[in-house]
Amino acid sequence: QNLPGNDNSTATLCLGHHAVPNGTLVKTITNDQIEVTNATELVQSSSTGRICDSPHRILDGKNCTLIDALLGDPHCDGFQNEKWDLFVERSKAFSNCYPYDVPDYASLRSLVASSGTLEFINEGFNWTGVTQSGGSYACKRGSDNSFFSRLNWLYESESKYPVLNVTMPNNGNFDKLYIWGVHHPSTDKEQTNLYVRASGRVTVSTKRSQQTIIPNIGSRPWVRGLSSRISIYWTIVKPGDILLINSNGNLIAPRGYFKIRTGKSSIMRSDAPIGTCSSECITPNGSIPNDKPXQNVNKITYGACPKYVKQNTLKLATGMRNVPEKQTRGIFGAIAGFIENGWEGMXXGWYGFRHQNSEGTGQAADLKSTQAAIDQINGKLNRVIEKTNEKFHQIEKEFSEVEGRIQDLEKYVEDTKIDLWSYNAELLVALENQHTIDLTDSEMNKLFEKTRRQLRENAEDMGNGCFKIYHKCDNACIGSIRNGTYDHDVYRDEALNNRFQIKGVELKXGYKDWILWISFAISCFLLCVVLLGFIMVXCQKGNIRCNICI
């Protein structure tokens, strides 16, 4: 490309930055849409569609809920003593044993899920005077009537049901979880047939708590051929405490205890398949990468996950302001510096030089300023991800119907947190983008000022990011300017002489222009005088007559 006004005694040096034909629009504090050469998406908006089995230990509940597996529903026997980091409950899960309810279902489910194990220890409870291991046709184990494997249904023996008083100390150094229940017969006859007395009572106590349950006799909706129910309760016995069970009927007794562990295990409802892959972050939609600071896939997560935001996209600028190179630059096709536009095709760096001298034209990148900008931008992305990745999981929130107001409050708090974080994320990205553009502009200005200080009076700033050098500057001379070893004293006298000669020519060309304008003005004036004289002579001789009508 030709830089006009050059000859063998001068040279032109332009400074510029790279550009791309089609940049990416990002948001800054001062501008909703500004084009940059490159940007990185910060919001993960899609999942893999499957739950990865590594590095977390995933336990697929299949047809069983966690509570059914805990109680020992016959079709969930395969889950006995299992362990997990994440228990995945399926929508197809069902109960296939005696119909039951858990008054504090959500709390029990959460407690067992966070423990991460169904490890069970049998204990030798002494149930004297009653029949043990009752079963039901509604709970088949194979072809036999059966019951929950972790519970012991006690009923009359020889038409007697004595008052039961059983104690079990906790001599271990861990918490014990006991699951027990109360049977609610559908009729008074069923009550007396099973427990002799017309009304039973169950009391379970520790040093810290006591629960007394009176059975509610009455018919309920039929489930698996039964209108009676079992209510499931649970008691935690601390180390050094004692479990005391007192009952005169209707007791569904524990067979032992579950070990309670403290951990970060959890449970998630999902129908996504489990695949052989690795991902730190899991959502009900499937696993997602956690290399981005934010995600828009699902509010519920497990593992080290990006924060959930409402935005579908947030782009972090990882390049400089993009000013595409103009395809034509006047009739001479001259290039310009960074003030007018960027340069496309500069692959070796972000900033660089273009020159024209007696040896031709050339281009070279400035690696030092390029590296300075890249180092600062690379640090940005890593810091944003580091600050925003969750190191814990967002569990599902469940409440019973009687806790509806608490559920509404929880939902409001969660929605407010999401709104707040979404706003903060957008603001953070806008601030970082503004800083990125400012720092890349700053590196360009630093390089330009560094070049200006080297050239001093040997060159003139052309106002477009270029310098007109007033001495002969071959490729070696241009190279010294680029690498900072240029000695302006060596070329000072030559530059001053050339500058005066060139300015003198420009001055003479300026006088010529003035003379041309003055000559044109005088010619026009004389033409007007001649025309006016002709009109006056003609009027005197009567050749021209003017009539004025009023």
UniProtKB/Swiss-Prot annotation:
Keyword Transmembrane helix attributed: yes
Keywords: Clathrin- and caveolin-independent endocytosis of virus by host, Clathrin-mediated endocytosis of virus by host, Disulfide bond, Fusion of virus membrane with host endosomal membrane, Fusion of virus membrane with host membrane, Glycoprotein, Hemagglutinin, Host cell membrane, Host membrane, Host-virus interaction, Lipoprotein, Membrane, Palmitate, Transmembrane, Transmembrane helix, Viral attachment to host cell, Viral envelope protein, Viral penetration into host cytoplasm, Virion, Virus endocytosis by host, Virus entry into host cell
InterPro entries registered for this protein in UniProt: Capsid_hemagglutn, Hemagglutn_HA1_a/b_dom_sf, Hemagglutn_influenz_A, Hemagglutn_influenz_A/B
Intrachain disulfide bonds: 14-466, 52-277, 64-76, 97-139, 281-305, 473-477
Transmembrane spans: 515-535
Protein name: Hemagglutinin
Protein role: Binds to sialic acid-containing receptors on the cell surface, bringing about the attachment of the virus particle to the cell. This attachment induces virion internalization either through clathrin-dependent endocytosis or through clathrin- and caveolin-independent pathway. Plays a major role in the determination of host range restriction and virulence. Class I viral fusion protein. Responsible for penetration of the virus into the cell cytoplasm by mediating the fusion of the membrane of the endocytosed virus particle with the endosomal membrane.
Gene Ontology MF term list: host cell surface receptor binding
Organism this protein belongs to: Influenza A virus (strain A/Bangkok/1/1979 H3N2)
Glycosylation sites: 8, 22, 38, 63, 126, 165, 285, 483
GO annotation, cellular component aspect: host cell plasma membrane; membrane; viral envelope; virion membrane
Other comment: Major glycoprotein, comprises over 80% of the envelope proteins present in virus particle. The extent of infection into host organism is determined by HA. Influenza viruses bud from the apical surface of polarized epithelial cells (e.g. bronchial epithelial cells) into lumen of lungs and are therefore usually pneumotropic. The reason is that HA is cleaved by tryptase clara which is restricted to lungs. However, HAs of H5 and H7 pantropic avian viruses subtypes can be cleaved by furin and subtilisin-type enzymes, allowing the virus to grow in other organs than lungs.
Record PTM text: Palmitoylated.
Positions where lipid (S-palmitoyl cysteine) attaches: 539, 546, 549
Oligomer status and interactors: Homotrimer of disulfide-linked HA1-HA2.
GO biological process, one term: fusion of virus membrane with host endosome membrane
Ranges in the topological domain labelled Cytoplasmic: 536-550
Location(s) in or outside the cell: Virion membrane; Host apical cell membrane
Site (Cleavage): 329-330
